[in-house]
Amino acid sequence: LVGSEMCIRDSYNISLDEIQRRVLEAISRGANEVCLQGGIHPKFDENTYIDIVKSIREVSDTIHIHAFSPLEISHGANCANTDVKSYLLKLKEAGLNSLPGTAAEILDDNVREIICPDKINTNEWLNVIKAAHSIGLHTTSTMMFGHVENYYDIAKHMHELKSLQLESNGITEFVPLPYVASEAPMYLRGLSRSGPSFRESVLVHSISRIYFNESIKNIQGSWVKMGYAGLSYLLDSGINDVGGILMNETITRSAGARHGQELDLIYIKNIVESKNMKLIERNTKYDLLKEPTKANFDKLKLKLKDIN
């Protein structure tokens, strides 16, 4: 498996039948997006990712498929002995709608050599995102912080993302991800910090709001990483998005986080309204849908919008 020093080593595979079952369950509960990503399995090839997308399309023509990190895309293209753009076109033809901008960690190769030496480098990550945008596939963007990086590395990471966005305008949101260390191999071997302080996490969200301004308009707070109490602070610090409700989150919980299985919408609605804000459902591309009610509280994507 190709991975990073921030990931635990236990791995598993999910069959196409199980993927279809989970998709159908999500649809039955009102989901409008399915998100898939994973590690690099030594037996996966270029057809694996295409078959996953096709299997979802067999059970739904309409659900938005948000899948495969730049690392997975790069792996698929290499297996196919083709360029990234050509491989992305095959995935798009199969039914892929957008990509998660994960596996970014910190976009500096000196840092990446420490935390994820087996992953793609900075330029390779950026090139996958650019290629996706060039064929009409939007992406998210992320940054994992609080491990071995310094403030300069954080600034450089944000600069790389902003420069890319000003060129291609395909990033829908920026998601700062505080490093969850408790079960991460790198931390257990004493090679990283124990994660950012709460104050650091809040400041990174605030700075990202100021720096990205109109270039990346949506700043998402990860309730999976920060919890409900943390989300309350982030709402005062520049975020306008609380992300997805989720049904089966495993990455953060496997690293030791206590949150991530499913969002309590009643509780989060009270937090949002206490900030004089309004909870509004959105889709993956940030089209606003409707205010959540008891009848649609199982919807997956939410958007925060200031009343004023």
Task: Describe each model-derived feature in a short phrase.
Residues 1-8:
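Short, small-residue-biased leader/transition segments that mark boundaries at the very start
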Residues 2, 59-63, 135, 168, ...:
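Helix C-cap/helix->beta junction micro-motif
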Residues 5, 35, 70, 111, ...:
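Generic signal for short, ordered secondary-structure residues
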